[in-house]
Every structure is written in structure tokens, then in C-alpha cells.
Regions:
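Conserved, well-structured interaction surfaces
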Residues: 41, 72-181, 417-424
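Short coil/linker segments at helix-helix boundaries
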Residues: 139-169, 179, 185-196, 201, ...
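Membrane-proximal, proline-rich intrinsically disordered regions
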Residues: 3, 20-71, 85, 237, ...
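Bacterial N-terminal signal peptides that target proteins for export
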Residues: 1-8
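Extended ligand-binding clefts on enzyme/binding-domain cores
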Residues: 229-429, 443
Length: 450
């Protein structure tokens, strides 16, 4: 009898534990989704965030190596990039944010979207994959592509032509999917898409602009079909005819300065709402425009014409006590003065003389250079592109104050495109016009180009 009671008690205990486990496992934790439970519409927003950040981080790094911006002498990785002395790992951040933040989610998103016949999400997958891998081959040349994003921990590398042609093909496939009609019961693209806010026509126009952009890179590959890796001027014009036709078709991400409580999860721990160029540039010290950028904006090709964007791209500093004998190319507006450009190429390049140095500010002496070298005195006219923020940095405005938040005499404006809430222009009507003008000019149609 005692033995029988023990058996019965054991069975009851097993049943109790099983029922408890079943009772506790009634929901999927929304804060910790698995690969199986994550919704494809939720993945898209995550993918878009990390893809855009990878693109913008790459853009800032390449702008240094292309000669538009530099940093103060000895200013670390970015200074070295601007003088073509790159250190190992200079481009690892775009790689990491693309693969670890965005691309690792692509296949699962596509699989779930395909099961739901969510054509627009599948189209977004194709276009984003083409956009991201084209960036990778632009930066690295060879890269895992056909074998990437799978279970192979050591994927095979593809050459640049394979990646390029694959991206072009995926772009065409994505455009076809975006043009399909989804069932009304299928999750709308707007639920996960903050790039185009669910506007499939905007995606189609942006995708065609990307196609024109990609084919235009082949200018030195000889005439022929773009599907064979040749320069195809007619395909560019055909794509542009389906691309942005006005500024209303621009693909723009509008950032905010609300100090979002949602932060990225790749270790930077920064708010997801502000501009990625603010993260990598605007909030950081020491970046200065080069003479090449300055000349292109203020005297392009020696024609004496100033670009109307010059005052917004070149940074300004407030100077209540201007010195006598300021260089002639320093522009003033009241007590504000616009930055000069750092000479990076001639024999008088500051780099050969220990410059450029960062300007300092004191409430008694204003702007000054901490150096006994008289050749460095005019380095105060190289204004840094640093700005601030009201939300994230709790600053009174977007101006950076070198000597502290309350010292208005030390204000710096920053540059428009790297401020905290500056928009990200992923594709614009202006770019479409420039590409069209270039193609027509090279075809000999100068009147059409102009």
C-alpha cells in the first residue's frame, strides 16, 4: 500500500510540473523575440536603421580620404585617413553595422515575407541587399556575397564584378516586387518602413535612381549592356525616366533631437532618432574643411562663382574680438566668420609645419592657438565642424560652445549636414538631374546637359 501511494504521488508531481510549465509558457516574450517569432515588418525598421548608419559612416570616412575634410594634426584615425595614411580597421565600422546590424536579419525577413506573400517587404529586401552589398564592394572590392549570410562561418569571397552584377540583378527583382499588388490582409509596408513611409512609388523611384547611380560607375568599362558590366548610357536614361521627377520624390530620412530612450544595440548605446552623421562627425571635435572643398564651394573651377550652399556647409565661429590682418578669404557676417580651407596639397601645406592646430578660447583673449610657432597663429581661421544638441546634450541650441554651455563668445555653428536633426538624403531629384546632365554631356548633347 505504501509503495502504491508513492507511485501515485510521483505521478501527481510529474503532472503538476508539466502543467506548470505549460501554464507559464502561454506567451512569446515581445521584448526578446527569437528568429522564429520576430515579425518581418518589425525586422525591416531594424534593417533600415543599421543599413543607413553603415552607409553614412562609410560616407564620412570616404569624404576624409577623398579630400573634402581633414582633422587637426595628429588627430588620430581620421587625420591619417585625410593624409592617405590609413590605419588597420579604418572601414570596419560600416562592415560591422551592415553585417551585424542589418544583413543578418535579411534572409529571415525575406522567408517570413514570402510565406505571407508580402511582395513589398520582399521588394524592400532585394533593394536593401543590393544597396548594402554595393557599398561593401565599393569599400572593399572583394567580399563574401553569394555565400554570405548563411550558415558557413567562412564564406567564399566573390570578386567585384560578381557582386556588382548580382546587385544590379537583385535591384531589378526588387523593383518588380515593389510593383506587385499585395492582398489587403497582408501587413502594409508602412508598418515597418520609415524610409519611404510605405510609399511603394517612392521606393520604385529611389530604386531606379540607385540603378542609374550604379550603372554610371561603369563609365570607364566601355560601352555595352549594363547586365554584362558595361557602361550603358541608355539604361541610365531609362532608369532616370522612372526615377525622381521632383523634390517630392526624394527619399529622405528626417531625424529628430528628442534624446530617444531607444538606443542602438551594437555597443555605441546612442539614441536611434538622431542623424548618424552627428554621431560620427557633428558631435566630435577637430574636423575642418579642406582647401579643395572650400575652393569647390566658393570658386568652382576658377569661375569666381560661389555655391549658394557654401555658407551652410562651411562652419562658422563667433568672434567678438577680430584680429587685424585676417586672411583675405575669410568671410564675415557681423561677428561671425566663416572657415577657411586647410591646404592639403601644396608646399605650404600646414601638415609640413606641424599644423593645422586646434583653436582654443578664453573669455579674456578670445580665440588663440596654443603654440609658440608664429606660422600657426592663423590656424584660428580653420573653424571646426562641431555642433551640439538640445535633446541629447541638453544644450540651449544646436551651436557648440567651445568654452562651455554658458560662454556664447565661443560659439561654433557646425555644418548643416552633420547636425543632430539634419536629414539624410538617400536619393534626391537633384542627384538624378546631375547624373542625367553628365550622361548627356558625355554623349555630346551639351544643350540638353545644361
Amino acid at each position: 500500500m505504501k509503495y502504491l501511494k508513492s507511485i501515485i504521488m510521483s505521478l501527481l508531481l510529474v503532472m503538476l510540473l508539466a502543467s506548470c510549465n505549460e501554464w507559464l509558457n502561454v506567451n512569446t516574450d515581445p521584448d526578446n523575440p527569437s528568429s522564429e517569432s520576430a515579425l518581418f515588418q518589425n525586422r525591416l525598421a531594424h534593417i533600415e536603421f543599421y543599413t543607413n548608419h553603415a552607409q553614412q559612416f562609410a560616407a564620412w570616412r570616404t569624404s576624409m580620404s577623398m579630400g573634402d575634410w581633414t582633422r587637426y594634426n595628429g588627430g588620430g584615425t581620421y587625420f591619417n585617413m585625410s593624409i592617405w595614411y590609413p590605419v588597420g580597421g579604418i572601414c570596419t565600422t560600416p562592415y560591422q553595422w551592415w553585417f551585424v546590424g542589418a544583413a543578418c536579419n535579411l534572409n529571415d525577413m525575406y522567408k517570413r515575407a514570402e510565406e505571407a506573400e508580402a511582395w513589398h517587404y520582399m521588394g524592400a529586401f532585394k533593394i536593401i541587399r543590393a544597396y548594402g552589398f554595393m557599398m561593401m564592394t565599393d569599400l572593399y572590392g572583394e567580399m563574401p556575397y553569394t555565400d554570405a549570410l548563411g550558415e558557413n562561418a567562412t564564406p567564399e569571397y566573390d570578386d567585384g564584378k560578381t557582386i556588382y552584377l548580382g546587385c544590379i540583378e537583385e535591384l531589378d527583382e526588387g523593383l518588380a516586387l515593389m510593383a506587385k499588388t499585395q492582398a489587403p490582409t497582408t501587413p502594409a509596408l508602412a508598418l515597418g518602413d520609415y524610409w519611404g513611409n510605405g510609399d511603394t512609388q517612392k521606393w520604385i523611384k529611389w530604386g531606379n535612381l540607385l540603378k542609374a547611380r550604379f550603372i554610371n560607375k561603369l563609365i570607364k568599362k566601355g560601352a555595352g549592356s549594363y547586365k554584362e558590366g558595361k557602361f550603358d548610357s541608355q539604361a541610365i536614361l531609362d532608369a532616370l525616366a522612372k526615377g525622381p521627377q521632383s523634390i517630392n520624390d526624394n527619399m529622405v530620412i528626417y531625424h529628430t533631437d528628442n534624446n530617444s530612450t531607444t538606443h542602438d544595440v551594437l555597443g555605441w548605446n546612442e539614441p536611434v532618432d538622431y542623424s548618424p552623421l552627428y554621431s560620427v562627425s557633428g558631435m566630435n571635435a577637430g574636423y575642418m574643411p579642406t582647401k579643395m572643398l572650400f575652393d569647390n564651394l566658393t570658386n568652382f573651377a576658377g569661375y569666381g562663382v560661389e555655391d549658394p550652399r557654401a555658407d551652410r556647409i562651411l562652419p562658422w565661429a563667433y568672434d567678438a574680438n577680430p584680429r587685424a590682418g585676417a586672411p583675405a578669404d575669410v568671410k564675415w557676417s557681423g561677428n561671425w566668420r566663416r572657415s577657411r580651407g586647410v591646404d592639403m596639397t601644396s608646399g605650404d601645406c600646414p601638415i609640413f609645419q606641424g599644423g593645422p592646430l586646434r583653436a582654443n578660447f578664453s573669455t579674456t583673449n578670445g580665440w588663440f592657438i596654443q603654440s609658440d610657432n608664429p606660422a600657426r597663429a592663423n590656424d584660428i581661421y580653420y573653424v571646426e565642424a562641431t555642433s551640439s544638441s538640445k535633446g541629447y546634450a541638453a544644450n540651449p541650441d544646436l551651436l557648440y560652445r567651445r568654452a562651455g554651455k554658458t560662454v556664447d563668445g565661443s560659439r561654433e555653428s557646425g555644418t548643416f549636414y552633420t547636425r543632430v536633426s539634419s536629414p539624410t538624403y538617400m536619393g534626391s531629384y537633384a542627384e538624378a538631374c546631375f547624373i542625367k546632365a553628365e550622361v548627356l554631356f558625355n554623349k555630346g548633347d551639351k544643350s540638353g546637359a545644361f
